[in-house]
């Protein structure tokens, strides 16, 4: 029986990235829907799983994506609400790649290391940064997330990121530094620093992180020049620089692709798997 993946994307055009990776992971048929709202999910999901007997539903799954993480979470909730009795299919949420990226990076950082009690600072309060903060906290880290000030972003039209409110809801300590100096001061006593800023924005200077005596490990999520952390190469795979281990965006990305494909394959091993942030992290811990 063919493996069918129903792609529910909250954007107008379903992600070609997610579609191609699905095929590379072994999906036979991809049914892609764009501009999906939670209200539309029930008919789409039930229209899919009613075509097969309950014993055959492991050959069908749902992928939730798009650029809006909050909307994606609502769609995933609606997918699960559409289930009843034996009629359920596995589902995964990875809007904007937030879950696979964060899970992979933290799995790489945590591999073979005891993170309990370590101080971690996340620069940037977007979806990937906050997912990373949550996972680091689960590993026992003392976590601080900081926003990126206007002088670092290079803009005169700064607005308070909505991620601050999300951080508060998640119980993550977050600060909004007024300028670069205040942001860099927040890195004092940090053992781990993750740069999760916009593409092409350098958020951390080499002279700052190289001189930090407590800093042990840095990771950069930005693969576009200039990179997020000065002095780190995109391909750095936990190599040592200035006495600290550094992880570049391409090293994270390569492992992320393996995790992404493994997650898709696992969706078809049973019909009741839900891969949210925690579920994806469990897969990442097995893969990296």
Label the predicted regions.
Residues 1-87, 279-288:
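N-terminal ligand-binding/catalytic initiation module
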Residues 35-39, 70-74, 100, 104, ...:
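Conserved active-site and cofactor/substrate-binding residues in soluble primary-metabolism enzymes
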Residues 84-92, 241-245:
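Glycine/charged-rich beta-loop-alpha catalytic/anionic-binding loops adjacent to active sites
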Residues 92-110:
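A glycine-rich, Thr/Ser-enriched phosphate-binding loop motif common to dinucleotide/cofactor-binding enzymes
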Residues 102, 127-132, 201-204, 227:
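Short glycine/serine/threonine-rich phosphate/pyrophosphate-binding segments
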Residues 110-192:
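Glycine-rich phosphate/diphosphate-binding loop of Rossmann-like nucleotide-binding domains
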Residues 172-246:
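Rossmann-like adenosine-cofactor binding region
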Residues 224-288:
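Adenosine-phosphate binding glycine-rich loop
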């Amino acid at each position: 029986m063919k493996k069918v993946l129903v792609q529910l994307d909250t954007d107008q055009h379903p992600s070609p990235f997610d579609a191609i990776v699905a095929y590379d992971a072994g999906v036979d048929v991809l049914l892609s829907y764009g501009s999906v709202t939670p209200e539309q999910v029930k008919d789409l999901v039930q229209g899919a799983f009613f075509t097969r007997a309950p014993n055959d539903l492991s050959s069908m799954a749902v992928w939730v994506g798009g650029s809006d993480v909050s909307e994606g979470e609502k769609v995933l909730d609606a997918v699960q609400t559409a289930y009843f009795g034996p009629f359920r299919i596995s589902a995964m949420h990875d809007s904007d790649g937030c879950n696979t990226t964060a899970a992979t990076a933290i799995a790489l950082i945590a591999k073979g290391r005891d993170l309990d009690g370590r101080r971690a600072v996340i620069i940037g309060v977007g979806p990937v940064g906050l997912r990373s903060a949550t996972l680091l906290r689960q590993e026992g880290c003392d976590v601080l997330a900081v926003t990126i000030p206007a002088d670092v972003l290079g803009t005169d039209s700064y607005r308070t990121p909505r991620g601050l409110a999300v951080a508060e809801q998640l119980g993550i300590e977050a600060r909004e530094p007024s300028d670069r100096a205040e942001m860099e001061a927040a890195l004092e006593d940090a053992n781990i620093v993750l740069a999760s800023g916009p593409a092409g924005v350098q958020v951390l200077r080499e002279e700052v992180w190289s001189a930090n005596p407590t800093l042990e490990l840095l990771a950069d999520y930005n693969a576009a020049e200039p990179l997020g952390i000065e002095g780190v190469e995109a391909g750095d795979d936990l190599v040592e620089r200035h006495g600290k281990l550094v992880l570049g965006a391409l090293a994270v990305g390569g492992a992320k692709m393996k995790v992404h494909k493994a997650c898709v394959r696992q969706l078809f091993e049973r019909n009741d798997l839900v891969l949210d942030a925690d579920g994806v992290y469990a897969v990442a811990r097995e893969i990296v």
